[in-house]
A protein has these predicted regions:
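Active-site neighborhoods and metal-handling regions in enzymes and metal-associated proteins
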Residues: 1-453
Length: 453
């Protein structure tokens, strides 16, 4: 919401014009004319008041700001996208700010983070590590075409003695800069993986709003509804409860459409008597939920629908139970897969565990936070990690099983906060048992009397 900005964070306080600074933020100037067209800007005063940064300057001041980047041991930054366009009328747009940063850091035209990382690894390794270096280098050159073209790396790989390798290390050292675009993303992954208490509260709000949407649709659903109408009810609830956006494109798939994992067309005019898979999440103050329910449009599961639903529900229960501190990111998936394999075998839909990916082709969990698929380290779960648990079974038409199963798609997704006291289902407000869903669908809806001309 505040584009064309730069944030500098120092590991140790830097003195600039007699002021000690831990961080510096550069933002756009207030401009009544542009704000009339594009919306309110924070400016310096707003950034200090609302964001809490004590040292704020206009972005036009970044070019001349007195920071010698070359004297730092490392300058950590995110890789730049190549699609940033230059607004020639703005000398402090993102394009210009990136160029100013590159000038300040003597950014090489041929900067390659993988090459720099490999140079650094080779030059800091001693002779006792030669075998490991050779393996890493060989794998890197084999899998990265750009690295394979590098003369120094190719020469190092073919060097026949330590004297040659030592000379090549010196040449590599001369080309290593203090620029590092690998470490900062890893640091941010760790910060985003473990939620602060304040973040948990915002996520609880986003998740609750999303669960309310599911509940209201359960009450309002009837077979003559369109997928887009169902989507509209969800998103109306989001806005009614203060969510600024949807966290991702809304998925409402009736019948066979539910077998398309990221189905966002939502254009089926009548859902009929099919199951309706609804995967939607409200975004509240930049934090997004991700909640999925699958419900029968006529209010009652058929025998076949319920048989599949029961397997997915049991798989989700196993996945949630596996979401504990110390477990690996794949633990919920392994638990869910075991249940789904057993269930599909019992129904005769598969004969062997190797067939399960035909009907359960995705993972069970991902991190949740500022993004619907949030960043994380994929290390063992810690207290206040927030993940989804979302097993599913999808049986497209013409699948190699009894046609009575064709077109059934079920996914149940909840947002699980992992704590030292066990997993907490933050989206439990929306019923997920088949009996609970059917009972909710019998409840009256505030939309029953809402008739448009």
């Amino acid at each position: 919401k505040e584009p064309h900005a730069v944030l500098l964070i120092y590991k140790e306080a830097q003195v600039v014009d007699g002021v000690a600074m831990d961080d510096v933020l550069f933002v756009q100037e207030r401009d009544p004319l542009r704000e009339q067209w594009d919306g309110y800007r924070l400016g310096i005063a707003g950034a200090k008041e609302k964001l809490g940064f004590p040292n704020v300057f206009f972005n036009t001041q970044f070019t001349d700001f007195k920071t010698d980047f070359n004297r730092f041991d490392q300058v950590l930054f995110f890789d730049f996208n190549n699609d940033v366009r230059d607004d020639v009328r703005n000398n402090a747009d993102l394009f210009s700010l990136i160029n100013s940063f590159k000038e300040k850091t003597n950014f090489p035209l041929d900067f390659n983070v993988e090459k720099t990382s490999l140079y650094r690894y080779i030059t800091t390794s001693d002779t006792n590590s030669s075998a490991n270096v050779a393996q890493v280098l060989s794998r890197s050159l084999r899998t990265n075409k750009d690295l394979a073209k590098d003369a120094l790396l190719a020469a190092y790989q073919s060097a026949i003695n330590e004297r040659q390798r030592a000379e090549l290390k010196q040449q590599m050292s001369a080309q290593i800069t203090n620029l590092n675009s690998q470490t900062l993303p890893m640091i941010m992954d760790g910060l985003r993986e473990i939620k602060l208490p304040e973040e948990v509260e915002l996520l609880k709000k986003a998740i609750y709003i999303s669960a309310v949407g599911q509940v209201e649709v359960m009450k309002a659903m009837y077979p003559d509804m369109s997928e887009r109408e169902i989507q509209g009810i969800h998103e109306f609830v989001f806005k009614k409860y203060g969510a600024e956006y949807e966290g991702y494109p809304s998925i409402v798939g009736g019948g066979h459409n539910g077998c398309v994992l990221h189905y966002i067309t939502n254009d089926k005019p009548i859902v009929g008597s099919d199951l309706v898979l609804m995967d939607l999440g409200a975004e509240y103050h930049n934090y997004t939920a991700d909640v999925t329910r699958t419900i029968p449009s006529d209010g009652t599961f058929s025998a076949e629908q319920r048989a599949i639903y029961d397997i997915v529900y049991e798989a989700q229960e196993a996945g949630i139970a596996a979401s504990v501190v110390g477990a690996g990111m794949r633990a919920p998936h392994y638990a869910a897969v075991e249940v789904i394999v057993k269930g599909l075998k019992a129904l005769g839909i598969i004969q062997d565990a190797s067939e399960v990916r035909k009907y359960f082709p995705h993972g069970t969990s991902h991190y949740l936070g500022l993004d619907v698929h949030d960043a994380g380290t994929y290390s063992p779960f810690q207290h206040n990690t927030l993940i989804t648990v979302e097993p599913g079974i999808y049986i497209p038409e013409n699948s190699p099983c009894d046609p009575k199963w064709w077109g059934i798609a079920v996914r149940i997704e909840d947002d699980i906060l992992i704590t030292n006291d066990g997993p907490i289902n933050l989206s439990a407000y929306a019923p997920r048992t088949p009996d609970g869903i059917e009972a909710m669908m019998r409840e009256p809806s505030v939309l029953d009397a809402f008739v448009l001309p």
